[in-house]
Amino acid sequence: TAVISDMFKKAFHIKSKKVETSLIEQFYYPKFGPGQLWEQTAADFEKMGGHLLMRHNVEKINVRDGRVLSVVCSTESGDKTIEGDIFISSMPVKDLIADISGEEAPQKIREIAAGLPYRDFITAGLLVDRLNLKNTTNIKTLGNIVPDCWIYVQEPDVKMGRIQIFNNWSPYMVEDPEHTVWIGLEYFCNEGDDMWNMSDEEFVNFASGELVKMGIIDSGSVKASHRERVKKAYPAYFDTYAEMDKVVDYLNSVDNLYCVGRNGQHRYNNMDHSMATAFRAVEHIMGVGGVTREDIWKVNTDKEYHEMQAEQNAATAD
């Protein structure tokens, strides 16, 4: 509905006060992709004296007297116990509650957390010679490819959900953006299902076959590929989610524990709002602006729709 409305408004030059994030035409994007943001963040953190521990998988969270005392992590060299004053968690709520030890969460809270649902995700990156989609717009692009950054797939006879065109996100992510196109194919699935269990070769053949079926690429045009599985990519709002407020109340009762991010709050927020939850958490810890623990959980909850935002004045100028 929003897509159709957007098309009509553009056709009749109607300005909208609000615009969906997925329909915004201008945005900031790191030169080498979102990973560059976190690489720079990590570098700045270490420059400020922070110690970043990689490949540490949290196995146990030790709680006593309403406070987290330490976490036990499995590493390549064995288990390691890490103590701290404040703990900020972005791990899935389901796993967080299950890992709490010593002073366990109440049985009801454990049951709610265990029942929280998720949708898992697979993406396949394909480097292709060209796309058969034509650029029929007045927007100039390298190689004159279609100007879209992402395309939602509506065909009922394919399983693909969305196509990313990385040349248009940032041409610096593609070695030869004038003669090749790097695309990302997105699929929604469940961990352990047939699609999830495909080998990389099987999945790439399947995904590229769907592109050929839709006429987007020609058979044999794939020059390179990469596939990634992402567990718990999409927190879902059914099953025990109706009682999520009880889990939030319990987590807020753990004095030095803060939950942030999409999985940390079991909320289908975009990247911007997910980062904002961390900002609110730090503001509360630092005692800035009167931010409460409840405010950390309220980021983006007062919107009409989770990806709706007020259109900035600069963006409305023709």
Predicted ranges, named:
Residues 1-64, 69, 83:
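Active-site/ligand-binding neighborhood in enzyme catalytic cores
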